[in-house]
Amino acid sequence: VQPEAEAPDRWRILAIVAVGVLLAMAPWFSASAVATPLAAEWRLDRLGLPTLTIAVQVGFAVGALALAMTAAADVLPARVLFAAGAVLAAAANAGFAFLATDLASAVPFRVATGLAIAGIYPVGLKLLAGWFRAERGLAIGVLVGALTVGSALPYLLRAVGVSQGLDWRATVGSASAAALLGGLLVFAAASRGPWDAPAPRFSLEIARSALREPAVRLANLGYLGHMWELYAMWTWVPLFLGASFAAAGASDPATASAAAFAVVASGGIGCVLAGAFADRLGRTTLTIAAMAVSGSSAIAAGFAFGAVPALTVAIAIVWGVTVVADSAQFSTAVSELAPAGTAGSALALQMALGFLLTGLTILAVGWLDPGDGSGWRIAFALLALGPAVGIVAMWRLRQRPEAVRMASGNR
């Protein structure tokens, strides 16, 4: 029996998986959301704080590769694997809040959180791939948007916690509760789609063969430029906003946390719009435009330090919308450009390298220790180097004859 042209339940499944991802991603930045009280209690310096986020990045990269190297995503139903990842992420995050007493004891819990989250987002993508064909670009855009809002969720939880006078552990505990709820939702309501197919096993040799293609290398370089900026921005913009508000004489931790949520979550809008229009505009056009605006916004945000909070937040929101809008386009480009049979391994390697790179820029900003306007201008100019390199890579990709394989010929 041939499946229908489009699965009738696809939008319901998209809503379930998107909400599940949004909730289950909450533990990721829970340490960044409580950076100020955590640093005071544990006496952390500016290198100690980013270490807690970098540990998650490393855990995720290792977990994503391990998932790709095994048949776990095919042996276990995707909804079961998703729920298991969410439960483990919630438990590890709770361990960080209620069992860890210093940086050394917290890092293993943060690494475990990243390992567990590797069973959430990639598995969510696999679930949706079984339900969508022609509209897969939009579905992936919605899912990346959900990941973005979920990454911002701890900042909203912190804003509520501060306004209620709650300890930082309440914020982290609430993020764990959100992850549990997201896992339960997907486990109870999601199901396998009519076009579900086994995921290809990861092979380093196959991935290397894909990288021999110049077009694949350029798409990967564009992705690395994008990742150079993205997660460092999400990690540090809350502290930047708090310091900027204080310099403007408007110090209020609850307002700063709420503003950080708005800035990071606004990227969800960019993801959905990019997912809807990428095939029409072309991947290189969209990625070049997004990186040009995000890189410019990074520099502008540094110069807006200490300005009227409304202006600083407005610039940061433009940055937030564009810094992640093009995220799904790089992986889609590799899937279109990689030789037959190599896309799965090429994408797994791309994701692992990208997330490992984020640790470098997150740490670099901490090492710069930007305490005032000049410090933040230098730090954000460093982040803007990523999109600058990405723009060059995607422009060179656009000139190559293989680029016609992307976005139905729209490059």
What are these regions (language model features)?
Residues 31-35, 215-268, 331, 361-362:
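Extracytoplasmic gate region of multi-pass secondary transporters
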Residues 337-371:
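A late C-terminal transmembrane helix in Major Facilitator Superfamily
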Residues 176-197, 390-398:
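C-terminal membrane-cytosol helix-exit motif in multi-pass small-molecule transporters
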